């Protein structure tokens, strides 16, 4: 029975080997089992689902068919998270680098603060040691207190202008104008004229300002002119002109005294113009009404002349009729 089954297995194995390409391998086993065996694996019938059939030939010529237990490696569905590992390592490296940069920056700031503190304390101690009664500063103030800007009050000097006649004109910040002759010392006891400030306008326009004299009278002057009232009561106006830098030093202005009408004269001139305008309109209306009246009279005269002619003709006709009846 054993020999018959072995012959059948050998015939089927030879048929399988002839149908497909086989791979032979030599396996050396223990001396009590077998010394040399040929293993043939059919590659055509091997699939992932069916077990592999292996033909083992013993040294005595007997062939045995053995079902393989080891299956071929199948491709795995689960992939290894290599990309995630790389990302995690990169993030860890960036965090480490950021921490290292922050630590280096903190150390540099701390080093700068430590290097600056002794210098500030030394300077403050040196300054406080010179003045008696000023305590030494041992603790440094916070950066907000030290960084507060100091407010310094600066007094702007009053500009003083000198005219060609030797008279000094001082213009204060409030808009007041002070005048002084050449013989007075300094600018004390000057005559003051108060002028209102004018807003900035377009070039070429004339700005009028009210100037108040010492007696309380207000006059209207342009913004580029200065009114001067002498001790005798005479009022003079000076026009300030900016001289070119090539002919005169900066800060000195030229003054001239053009004739400027006062406010009452301007008011009288304005009233006179209004009165003349009204008179012209009234004369024009009177001439128009006169022409209309004359034309109406001429029409009436023409009507009366026609009526007179008609009456004369009727009178002649009545006379002729009366003469015939009398005959």
From Swiss-Prot:
There is a cross-link at residue 122 (Glycyl lysine isopeptide (Lys-Gly) (interchain with G-Cter in SUMO2)). Phosphorylation of Ser-119 allows CREBBP binding. Stimulated by phosphorylation. Phosphorylation of both Ser-128 and Ser-119 in the SCN regulates the activity of CREB and participate in circadian rhythm generation. Phosphorylated upon calcium influx by CaMK4 and CaMK2 on Ser-119. CaMK4 is much more potent than CaMK2 in activating CREB. Phosphorylated by CaMK2 on Ser-128. Phosphorylation of Ser-128 blocks CREB-mediated transcription even when Ser-119 is phosphorylated. Phosphorylated by CaMK1. Residues 297-318 are annotated as: Leucine-zipper. There is a cross-link at residues 271, 290 (Glycyl lysine isopeptide (Lys-Gly) (interchain with G-Cter in SUMO1)). Disulfide bonds: none annotated. It comes from the Eukaryota. GO terms for cellular component: ATF4-CREB1 transcription factor complex; axon; centrosome; chromatin; ciliary basal body; cytosol; euchromatin; mitochondrial matrix. Residues 269-327 form the bZIP domain. Residues 1-29, 94-113, 126-149 are annotated as: Disordered. The modification Phosphoserine is found at residues 119, 128, 257. Pfam families: bZIP_1 (PF00170), pKID (PF02173). Residues 8-146 form the KID domain. The keyword DNA-binding applies. InterPro entries: bZIP, bZIP_sf, CREB1-like_pKID, Leuzip_CREB. It is found in: Nucleus. CDD domains: bZIP_CREB1. PANTHER family: CYCLIC AMP RESPONSE ELEMENT-BINDING PROTEIN B (PTHR45879), CYCLIC AMP-RESPONSIVE ELEMENT-BINDING PROTEIN 1 (PTHR45879:SF1). Belongs to the bZIP family. Phosphorylation-dependent transcription factor that stimulates transcription upon binding to the DNA cAMP response element (CRE), a sequence present in many viral and cellular promoters. Transcription activation is enhanced by the TORC coactivators which act independently of Ser-119 phosphorylation. Involved in different cellular processes including the synchronization of circadian rhythmicity and the differentiation of adipose cells. Regulates the expression of apoptotic and inflammatory response factors in cardiomyocytes in response to ERFE-mediated activation of AKT signaling. This is Cyclic AMP-responsive element-binding protein 1. It comes from Rattus norvegicus. The gene is Creb1.
